[in-house]
Amino acid sequence: MSTSKAITLTLFIATTLLAPCNAAANATTKPLFPAILIFGDSTVDTGNNNYPLPTIFRAEHFPYGMDLPDGKANGRFSNGKLISDIIATKLNIKEFIPPFLQPNLSDQDILTGVCFASAGAGYDDLTSLSTQAIRVSEQPNMFKSYIARLKGIVGDKKAMEIINNAFVVVSAGPNDFILNYYEIPSRRLEYPFISGYQDFILKRLENFVRELYSLGVRNVLVGGLPPMGCLPIHMTAKFRNIFRFCLEHHNKDSVLYNEKLQNLLPQIEASLPGSKFLYADVYNPMMEMIQNPSKYGFKETKRGCCGTGFLETSFMCNVFSPVCQNRSEFLFFDSIHPSEATYNVIGNLLDPLIRGKFQA
């Protein structure tokens, strides 16, 4: 056999053998959804509060974002990625989700999805009165502007196809309870029992996701409450004890709310043809990390990495604040918000649940 024929045959065999591998690789890297859309509060706000808003709830300054690839703060309330970024990466949509208010969004940014969330927001409009954040109830108006721009890029039919098949994340609630019930009792006269206020918030949540559905959304992940009694700032405000135990009665409130939410979502899904709703449990994973920290590589779960870790968040966590060196060993980055390491654990748990629900 001539040398040229031998080379040709070798290349043919190699190409044939590698073809299935390439096909498998393409299958695994193909996005499960065409776009990802984010609504809610600081747990998922990727930088909307950077832009002209009269709010102090900002994270566009060091040390926020210090573990991002460029090491620069961009509005995310963590040292690195948020849970929404991690989910988007795992679903092969994009690595980072841009905020909708970012002025230089590209067509590709619009096509693959953006974030409408605002740090300090809540389902209760009263929450944003004190924080000056973009109310959750206002975020659908931003979404309508997004839809108009999307239609301008790909046309009406393709735009609605993208929205119908997009993956949507809704994450809010903690601010409502902290600002309107626990720390500032502005809703206690109206709702003397926490269960009544929970029902009010859940009704607001239901109205919100129904509005998203009316705009074309079909695939929705809804986040529950974290263990509110274990947030460092909450322990500082409510617990004058050097041992800093979690506030169990507030954790019980979170459990009750989450149980109600888990019961509500299937009811909403059944009433909205073609919709799929998935509950995102953050409470149990975080409690597991708090109770068994070494299993996940954590050494500190009762305070944040920034400053003393007891009070600092937003403008109080700043360039003058000392920052821990071993950020992957801290459950919280500031006194409210989880570290990227925590979000990675939660993202790993959510990924198979998302695929199981939405690939079926």
UniProtKB/Swiss-Prot annotation:
CDD domains: SGNH_plant_lipase_like. The keyword Lipid metabolism applies. GO terms for molecular function: hydrolase activity, acting on ester bonds. One of its GO terms (biological process) is lipid catabolic process. It is found in: Secreted. It comes from the Eukaryota. The active site is at 42 (nucleophile), 334, 337. The keyword Hydrolase applies. Residues 1-23 form the signal peptide. It is an enzyme of class 3 (hydrolase). Gene3D superfamilies: SGNH hydrolase. Glycans are attached at residues 104, 326. Keywords: Glycoprotein, Hydrolase, Lipid degradation, Lipid metabolism, Secreted, Signal. Its EC number is 3.1.1.-. Transmembrane segments: none annotated. GO terms for cellular component: extracellular region. Its main location: secreted. Belongs to the 'GDSL' lipolytic enzyme family. This is GDSL esterase/lipase At2g31540. The lineage of its organism: Eukaryota, Viridiplantae, Streptophyta, Embryophyta, Tracheophyta.
